[in-house]
Amino acid sequence: MKVSKLWLREWVNFSLTEQELAEQLTMAGLEVDAVNPVAGQFTHVIVAEVLNTKPHPDADKLTLCEVNINKDKPLKIVCGAANVRPGLRVALAMIGAHLPGGLQIKESKLRGELSQGMLCSATELGLAEHSEGIMELSDEAPIGMDLREYLALDDHVFDIDLTPNRADCFSILGVAREVAVLNKLPLIEQPIVTVPPAIDDGLRVNLIHSEACPRYCGRIIRNLNLEAKTPLWMAERLRRGGIRTLHPVVDVMNYVMLELGQPMHAFDLSKINGEINVRYSASGEQLELLDGQEVVLNDNVLVIADKEKPLAMAGIMGGANSAVQEQTQHIFLESAYFNPVTIAGVARKYGLFSDSSQRFERGVDPCLQSKALERATELILSISGGEPGPVIESFDKKFLPGTVSFLFDTTKVKKLTGLSIPLNEMKNLLEGLGVVIIKETNHFFEVTIPSHRVDLQQDADLVEEIIRLYGYDKLQAQPMQTSVQAGLISAKEKIATHVSSWFSAKGYHETISYSFVDPELQEALYPQKEFMELLNPISSELSQMRAGMWPGLIASMIYNSHRQQTAVKFFEIGVVFDLDGGQLKERSCIAGLLMGEQGNLNWSESARLFDFYDLKGDLQSLFASLKLDDVEFIQSSHHALHPGQSAQIVINGKHSGWIGVLHPRLSDAFDLDQDVVLFELNLESLINPTIPLYKPISKYPQIRRDLSFLVDRQISAMQIERVIRNTVKEDWLKSFDVFDVYMGKGIPEDKKSIAVAMTLQDDTRTLVDAEINLTISAIIKKLENEFSILLRE
C-alpha cells in the first residue's frame, strides 16, 4: 500500500517527520519498506501559459512559442512537443533551473531561434516513467506559481507492506486511523455527500448466489461529458498511490478505492442486457478481460452477468465487453461486498492480480458499499457531469458478517504479555481503534468491534492491539507469570504411543503415508466399499481418501521390495475415512505387514520366510502387553486375503480387524514373488477399560495335561479352545497351546489330529488328581457333544 504523507495529513493532522512516521508505523505492525519523494529534484520550474505559437522557420518539428509567466514581457521558447498550443498552461523550466538527471537550463539558440527556457514533460520532471508531449496543467493553474507548490510535490510516499490480517489499512482512511490512535489525535472525518437522484433509471439486481455476494449496490449515471478529463490533482494522487490514469470514471473508481478501501467497478450501461445477475459461472463460459486475456471459466468462479453473458469476474477484473471507453456516455457503477472465501485463490488460479482482488481476498468493510458509491457519484458529477439515478441496494442479511461482540477479560493483557497497563489506558486505546465499550464490570469489558476490523474476533486479538499501540518497546525482559495446567493424554493417545513403541521394539519400521491413495490399488483391496473422491487431487494416483491402511503400506512395501530389501516389517498408525450414506467418518487404525526372510542368516537354523503365524504371534504378544484376554482369531474370508489364510480379529466380542496373507491374485498383480502377511485393527478396540489389579504369583504347583483329538478338518483349534475355556473352572486354565496338527497316513481323509497342551493351576490351593481327572472327563464329553471329537489314545 502506497500512502502519500500530504494526503494522509488531510485525515489526521500530525507533525512527525518522514523518518519518525515510518518508524512509528513499523513498530505498530505496519512495516514501511521504503519512503520515497513523489517527484525528482528540480528548481525554478513554474506554471506558464502559451500565448501563441508559430512554426520554426528552419525545422519542421519545432514550434516557436510566446509564453506568459505573469511578468511584463513574455518569454520566447522553442518547443518540439506536438501538443503545444495557445491557451495551454504548462510547466516551464526557467533559465538557471536544475532538472532531474543533472540538466541545467540555459538561454540558447535552436536552429537560429532564441529559447529562454524549456517546456517540460512529466518524464523530464521525474513525475512519470513515460509521457507523450509536454505536461498539460489545469486551466485554473496560477500563472507564475512554482510548480512544486502548485502540485504539492514536496511530499513523500510511504510503501507499507501489510500483513494478511490488516485489510483495513488498504486505504488512506485505514492508515489514518492508525496514525490517529498512535498519536492520540482526532481523525478528521471527510464528509460524504448523499447525491439525490436526478432520474429514475435503475437496473434490477439479482443475488442468485447471495452466500458469495451478500450485498450489492449500484447506480446508473447518464449523459457524461465526453470531453471531460481527470483533474491533475486526482491524477497526481493516483500516481502517488501507484495507479496510472485511464479514464475519468475509471480514475474515480480507483481514487475511492485508495481513499476509503472499497474496490468499485464501472460498466458501460449500453453493453448491459436488462439486469445484473450475481452468480457462479457455468463451466466453459468465456470472458475477455480488461487486460486482453481471454479466460475459460469453470463452475466455481463468481461473475457479474446480465441476462445473456458474464460481464466481469466478481472482485477480480472486469470484462472488455462492458468496459468504459472514451465514447461511453452512460454508466452503471458497482460497489459490492464479496465473501473473501469466494474470491481467495481464484485470481492466482487464472494468473491474475488486481488491487481489487487483493482487498476482497482479505476482507473489506461490509458496511462501506453505499458510502463509497455516494463518494464516487459526487466525484464523477464534479468531473464529468451527468444525471444520477437512485442507489440500488440488494442484500441478504443471512450471509452478511454480523456485529462482533464479546466479553474481553483485561487480565489477559498481563497474563499474555507480562505488562501491567492501567484499565483506563486500555480503554482509551481500544476506543481509539473504534471499539465500542458497552459495559465495564470489574476487569471485564463488553466490547463491540467496528465493522472494518474483520481481524478482531477474540480476547487475544485485543491483547495484541493494546500491546502494539501501547508500544512493544515498553516490554521489559522479565519472567512470565502464568498458571500452567498439565495436559491430559487421552486413552487413544496412550494406546497409540504404547503400540508404536511395542512394534518398534519388535523390529518393525513405522511408515507415514499420504491419506490420499491410488484409486486402482484401493478398489482392488476394498471393492465392496465406497470412497471419497478428491475434487483437486495432487495427482491422479492420489485422488481418493483412504478407506483403510493397507494401500499405503503395500505401496511402501512394493517400493522397498523392488530395491532389494529382503525383509520388510512395517506398521503405521493413522486415520482412515469411511463414506457412510454420503457422510465422511474418521476412524483411527493400526496396520502392519511382513514380507521376506525371517531373521538374519544363522549357523544353527536355516532361513525361512515370514508366514501367517509370525504376524499372529506378534499380535498375540501385543494383546498380552495390553492385558486383552478376550481375543479370538476367527477364520473368515476377505476379498484382499488368501481364502485359506485369513481371519477376523474379534476383541471383547466385537469385530475389530483382519489378519491374513495377501490374495495370490493381488500378489501376481503387484509382481510379488513372496507371501505378504498383513493386519489392520481399529485402534480404539485396543483400549482396555479395566483397571489392572495386583495379583501375587501363585505358590501352588502347575499341572500340565496333553490331549490329542481326532476332529473334522473344518473344526478349528479356536473352537476347541473356546469349549475348553468354558468348561474348565474359572481361573484354573493358565495356558492353552496347540503343539501338533497332523493330516495324512493313519488319519481318515476328512479328519485331522490336533494335540493341545493345557496348564492348570489354582491360586489358593494345590489341585489333586481326582479334580484334574474330572475336569478332563468333562472337557472330552463336551467336545464329543459339540463336534463329535474323539480322544486319541
UniProtKB/Swiss-Prot annotation:
Question: Which Gene Ontology terms of cellular component type are present?
Answer: phenylalanine-tRNA ligase complex
Q: What name does this protein carry?
A: Phenylalanine--tRNA ligase beta subunit
Compartment(s) of residence: Cytoplasm
A Pfam match: tRNA_bind
* Cross-referenced PANTHER family: PHENYLALANINE--TRNA LIGASE BETA SUBUNIT (PTHR10947:SF0), PHENYLALANYL-TRNA SYNTHETASE BETA CHAIN AND LEUCINE-RICH REPEAT-CONTAINING PROTEIN 47 (PTHR10947)
Under Enzyme Commission nomenclature, its number is: 6.1.1.20
Name the keywords, alphabetized.
Answer: Aminoacyl-tRNA synthetase, ATP-binding, Cytoplasm, Ligase, Magnesium, Metal-binding, Nucleotide-binding, Protein biosynthesis, RNA-binding, tRNA-binding
**Do you know which Gene3D superfamilies this protein is assigned to?**
3.30.56.10, Bira Bifunctional Protein, Domain 2, Ferrodoxin-fold anticodon-binding domain, Nucleic acid-binding proteins, Phenylalanyl-trna Synthetase, Chain B, domain 3
The record describes its quaternary structure and partners as: Tetramer of two alpha and two beta subunits.
- Cofactor stoichiometry and binding remark: Binds 2 magnesium ions per tetramer.
Q: Which reaction does it catalyse?
A: tRNA(Phe) + L-phenylalanine + ATP = L-phenylalanyl-tRNA(Phe) + AMP + diphosphate + H(+)
Output the superkingdom of the source species: Bacteria
Q: Which cysteines are disulphide-bonded?
A: none
Any single GO molecular-function term of the entry would be:
magnesium ion binding
UniProt-listed SUPFAM superfamilies: Anticodon-binding domain of PheRS (SSF54991), Class II aaRS and biotin synthetases (SSF55681), Nucleic acid-binding proteins (SSF50249), PheT/TilS domain (SSF56037), Putative DNA-binding domain (SSF46955)
